[in-house]
Curated annotation (Swiss-Prot):
Sequence repeats lie at residues 46-55, 56-65, 66-75, 76-85, 92-101. The gene is KRTAP13-3. Disulfide bonds: none annotated. In the hair cortex, hair keratin intermediate filaments are embedded in an interfilamentous matrix, consisting of hair keratin-associated proteins (KRTAP), which are essential for the formation of a rigid and resistant hair shaft through their extensive disulfide bond cross-linking with abundant cysteine residues of hair keratins. The matrix proteins include the high-sulfur and high-glycine-tyrosine keratins. This is Keratin-associated protein 13-3. Residues 46-101 are annotated as: 5 X 10 AA approximate repeats. Pfam families: PMG. InterPro entries: KRTAP_PMG. Keywords: Keratin, Repeat. The lineage of its organism: Eukaryota, Metazoa, Chordata, Craniata, Vertebrata. The keyword Cytoplasm does not apply. Belongs to the PMG family. Interacts with hair keratins. GO terms for cellular component: cytosol; intermediate filament.
């Protein structure tokens, strides 16, 4: 099964009121349960769990996974897919592979509330690290480690071993 992967420049793309992006429309072939971000990459068709080269590397990731795969290939910036659904995980893994010599780093992204990013339970600079146990409000019933599907601005990737997400109102 393949998906048509949107490139960057999509305008106000809002999938189910989930997140909003700059650029043009994503189109119906955009997987509703994946969030995709890239820079300077042309669209291509990706097989789940595999990648194709079209001037840069684009990657599709399984929608039922709590992992995030981020790949950088010159001259392009990073391409990432995130699971759209909130999922409980035993661990959160973020992989950074690219020409800048980065290996693998593990971290959990910040928990997003309805209006802002929460810094509770986070490490230095507001980042939450691998296997950090968190407790959210009873209404959300997330009491263990989990990954949130969050869009990261592409040019802020290689900032630290963990990355602060870009949260929008109405995340939940």
């Amino acid at each position: 099964m393949s998906y048509n992967c949107c490139s960057r420049n999509f305008s106000s793309c809002s999938h189910g009121g989930y997140l909003h992006y700059p650029g043009s429309s994503c189109g119906s072939s955009y997987p509703s349960n994946l969030v995709y971000s890239t820079d300077l990459c042309s669209p291509s068709t990706c097989q789940l769990g595999s990648s194709l080269y079209r001037g840069c590397q684009e990657t599709c990731w399984r929608p039922n996974s709590c992992q995030t795969l981020c790949v950088e290939s010159s001259p392009c910036h990073t391409s990432c897919y995130y699971p759209r659904t909130h999922m409980l995980c035993n661990s959160c893994l973020t992989m950074h592979v690219g020409s800048r010599g980065f290996g693998s780093n593990s971290c959990c992204s910040l928990s997003c509330g309805s209006r802002s990013c929460s810094s509770l339970g986070c490490g230095s600079n507001g980042f939450r690290y691998l296997n950090y146990r968190i407790h959210t409000s009873p209404s959300q019933s997330y009491r263990s480690r989990f990954c949130h599907p969050i869009y990261f601005p592409p040019r802020r990737w290689f900032h630290s071993s963990c990355y602060q997400p870009f949260c929008r109102s109405g995340f939940y």
